[in-house]
């Protein structure tokens, strides 16, 4: 029994301590509830803090949890953020056991909150799963921290003159909807450098690199007063990889393929025609597909200029073959006319060839005469030996020599136009590429954002 007494004493002490803790917990919760009830008693959430007196200052900062995607066609972007606002309400000062009271979203509806809205937002969503994603903290000096999780779809004006070597500054503008700057002003809580945080893992962009962000504030005038507008610029630089693979490389290869026809014999009309028509159709298809990922802007982009020049080279190669074929036919016809003009005129038949008739008298033992006429073009066959002797005594007529057929000058081989084109076309295309890439890659294509502090 003596040994059990210490253990009984320890058990009783622990039970007493636990009861004290429970009493303190109940007292703490009852005290906090009493504090909140006292704060809300007579509180009018229709009036801003300092109504009729000092200007209410709302400090803001943004934490981006997900940035993207960015749509070029719609000129908009989407991001998921924690939007934080901090202000001081003198009516909510308290003294109690805790310096900070962490409360749920039910408290938000009972106090005054800023009427912040996004000026260039197309669609914004406040997340409510599984409960409204809102954080509310109240400090003893009346300072309030109010955080919401939002998905914002905002407008991003783009000028695509340098596409696809372009960069854009997509803004996010917000401010008070109803209160002018004489009643509410917005400031950056952590200063202009650290008030907007975008972790590297938050960016989920396929065609862009998020290279940074800048903040600014400005005052705009309207019929209802002057309002303070806070702006965040997200600087995006487009990636070139996709367009190099899908557009630029096929265009360059098509132009090179069109110039292969300069090395094909000019007499191979079907082969060169197929080269020309195929490359022209290919360039047409590439130009159409390149526009699918762009809005229907009224000006030419950098890629449009490149495709247009490539199309001009391909079309010029087809025109070059038409010129070669035309001048080849012209040369052939001219050579034929010259050959006909330079030919020897036909020789007139001599009297001997027309009227000369040889009379051969053949004597035989039967004492009769046989006369036979032969022309100068045929030689008779006389079986008689005496006739052969008589024929041998007859003078031999020489036939008129026949001139050989006329030979036209050869029109095959390589045309001088082809010879010049083999050099001029590749050199001109290489020079164009050199100038094009130097100009656009060395150019600062990032859009300048206004930073009025």
From Swiss-Prot:
Tissue expr: Expressed in brain, in cerebellar granule cells.
InterPro entries found in the cross-reference section: GABAA/Glycine_rcpt (IPR006028), GABAAa_rcpt (IPR001390), GABBAa6_rcpt (IPR005436), Gabra-1-6_TM (IPR047024), Neur_chan_lig-bd (IPR006202), Neur_chan_lig-bd_sf (IPR036734), Neur_channel (IPR006201), Neuro-gated_channel_TM_sf (IPR036719)
Any one GO BP annotation for this protein: gamma-aminobutyric acid signaling pathway
Membrane topology according to the record: Multi-pass membrane protein
Sites where the protein binds 4-aminobutanoate: 84, 147
Domains (record comment): GABAARs subunits share a common topological structure: a peptide sequence made up of a long extracellular N-terminal, four transmembrane domains, intracellular or cytoplasmic domain located between the third and the fourth transmembrane domains.
Name listed for the protein in its UniProt record: Gamma-aminobutyric acid receptor subunit alpha-6
GN (gene name): Gabra6
């Amino acid at each position: 029994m003596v040994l059990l007494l210490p253990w009984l004493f320890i058990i009783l002490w622990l039970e007493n301590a636990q009861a004290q803790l429970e009493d303190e917990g109940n007292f703490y919760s009852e005290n906090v509830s009493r504090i909140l009830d006292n704060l809300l008693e007579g509180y009018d959430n229709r009036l801003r803090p300092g109504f009729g007196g000092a200007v209410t200052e709302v400090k803001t900062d943004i934490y981006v949890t997900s940035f993207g995607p960015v749509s070029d066609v719609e000129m908009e972007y989407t991001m998921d953020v924690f939007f934080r606002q901090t202000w001081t309400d003198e009516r909510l000062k308290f003294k109690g056991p805790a310096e900070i009271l962490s409360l749920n979203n039910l408290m938000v509806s009972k106090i005054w909150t800023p009427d912040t809205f996004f000026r260039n937002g197309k669609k914004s969503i406040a997340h409510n799963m599984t409960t409204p994603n809102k954080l509310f903290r109240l400090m003893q000096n009346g300072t309030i921290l109010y955080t919401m999780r939002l998905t914002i779809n905002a407008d991003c004006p783009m000028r695509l003159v340098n596409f696809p070597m372009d960069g854009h500054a997509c803004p996010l503008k917000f401010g008070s909807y109803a209160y002018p700057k004489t009643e509410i002003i917005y400031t950056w809580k952590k200063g202009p450098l650290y008030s907007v945080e975008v972790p590297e893992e938050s960016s989920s962009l396929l065609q862009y690199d998020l290279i940074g962000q800048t903040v600014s504030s400005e005052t705009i005038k309207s019929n209802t007063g002057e309002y303070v507008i806070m702006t965040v610029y997200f600087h995006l630089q487009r990636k070139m990889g996709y367009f190099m693979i899908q557009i630029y490389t096929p265009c360059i290869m098509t132009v090179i393929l069109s110039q292969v026809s300069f090395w094909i014999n000019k007499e191979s009309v079907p082969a060169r025609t197929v080269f020309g028509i195929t490359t022209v159709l290919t360039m047409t298809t590439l130009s159409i597909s390149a526009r699918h990922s762009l809005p229907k802007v009224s000006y030419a982009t950098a890629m449009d200029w490149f495709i247009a020049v490539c199309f001009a080279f391909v079309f010029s190669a087809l025109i070059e073959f038409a010129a070669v074929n035309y001048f080849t036919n012209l040369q052939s016809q001219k050579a034929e006319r010259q050959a006909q003009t330079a030919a020897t005129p036909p020789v007139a038949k001599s009297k001997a060839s027309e009227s000369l008739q040889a009379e051969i008298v053949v004597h035989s033992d039967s004492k009769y005469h046989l006369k036979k006429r032969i022309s100068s073009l045929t030689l008779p066959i006389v079986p008689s030996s005496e006739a052969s002797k008589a024929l041998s005594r007859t003078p031999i007529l020489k036939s008129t020599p026949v001139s050989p057929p006329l030979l036209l000058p050869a029109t095959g081989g390589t045309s001088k136009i082809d010879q010049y084109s083999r050099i001029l076309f590749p050199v001109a295309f290489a020079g164009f590429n050199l100038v094009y890439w130097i100009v656009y890659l060395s150019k600062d294509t990032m859009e300048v954002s206004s930073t009025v502090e």
